[in-house]
């Protein structure tokens, strides 16, 4: 998957960076961090599979609400408990991402970020892997209302069950339930975790300049766009990987750059990125476009060109 990637930035200066997303192996300097991050990422596909298979407890909850009584309410509670345990697994995974993501930012952004992306390709691949996971998760979560419905029912029923013999079965109590509720209430919870984690990281770690992080994200977005636009790959899954990494980079850039990703002089080639995403016309494209529309924070700023707003907001 390694290709020579070229893009022209806002200053019309051509950059050429080799990134081998398919075959990149960690160097000795990368190995320890790569192993740490990989121990988290390797579980990502199973998390996505469980989320896609999440059917929810709608029928049990409906019966308990429309025909309340010990039998229907106990049945709903017993159905919801294992589902909520699964939701906790999703939430706990977000905490692991919250821990490992700043470590990647330090490695890739402490020094020249473009050189770091080129010279630490295994870590650059992991950055793209995180964006790929986050956009997959959020896209699947957004179209599954059973997740929030199940957890809302759990919280409503929690206090009553704490007063009964069912108390012994309760693993997720008030404080954790409150944190999980905030997590699942957000339309794109995993991306929210990344953006909040990055903002917090930049406010606390003075060794990594903010400009280095935004440069790394703009570079990642532009080269991923270039890979798709120049038809480097025929496999749909590789193109979608690049598009998710591109969109994730743009969203995070928009959250931490003072002017955001959409201004005329943005280092992100935002118009070509949007055009390529719309032209991709895949099953996942609408979800990625919605992520750009609703998860970014600067799209509706007065400095955003009208043509960009129209391009993104109109189908």
From Swiss-Prot:
Disulfide bonds: none annotated. It is a lipid-anchor. It holds the Pfam family CYRIA-B_Rac1-bd. It is found in: Membrane. GO terms for molecular function: small GTPase binding. Belongs to the CYRI family. This is CYFIP-related Rac1 interactor homolog.
């Amino acid at each position: 998957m390694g290709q020579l990637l070229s893009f022209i930035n806002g200053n019309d200066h051509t950059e050429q960076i080799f990134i081998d997303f398919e075959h990149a192996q960690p160097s000795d300097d990368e190995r320890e961090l790569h192993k740490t991050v990989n121990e988290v990422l390797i579980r990502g596909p199973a998390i996505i599979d469980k989320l896609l298979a999440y059917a929810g407890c709608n029928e049990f909850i409906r019966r308990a609400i429309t025909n309340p009584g010990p039998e229907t309410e106990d049945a709903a509670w017993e159905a919801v408990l294992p589902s909520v345990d699964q939701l906790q697994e999703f939430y706990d995974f977000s905490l692991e991402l919250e821990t490992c993501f700043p470590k990647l930012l330090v490695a890739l952004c402490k020094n020249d970020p473009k050189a770091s992306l080129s010279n630490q390709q295994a870590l650059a691949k992991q950055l793209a892997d995180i964006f790929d996971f986050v956009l997959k998760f959020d896209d699947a979560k957004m179209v599954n209302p059973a997740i929030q419905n199940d957890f809302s029912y759990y919280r409503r029923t929690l206090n009553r069950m704490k007063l009964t013999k069912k108390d012994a079965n309760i693993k997720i109590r008030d404080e954790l339930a409150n944190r999980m509720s905030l997590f699942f209430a957000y339309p794109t919870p995993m991306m929210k975790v990344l953006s909040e984690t990055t903002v917090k990281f930049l406010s606390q770690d003075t060794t990594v300049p903010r400009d280095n992080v935004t440069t790394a994200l703009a570079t990642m977005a532009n080269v991923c766009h270039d890979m798709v636009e120049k038809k480097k790959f025929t496999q749909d899954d590789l193109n979608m990987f690049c598009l998710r990494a591109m969109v994730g980079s743009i969203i995070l850039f928009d959250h931490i750059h003072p002017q955001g990703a959409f201004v005329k002089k943005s280092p992100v080639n935002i118009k070509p990125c949007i055009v390529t995403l719309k032209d991709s016309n895949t099953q996942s494209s609408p979800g990625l476009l919605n992520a750009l529309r609703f998860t970014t924070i600067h799209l509706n700023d007065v400095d955003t060109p009208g043509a960009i707003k129209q391009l993104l907001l109109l189908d």
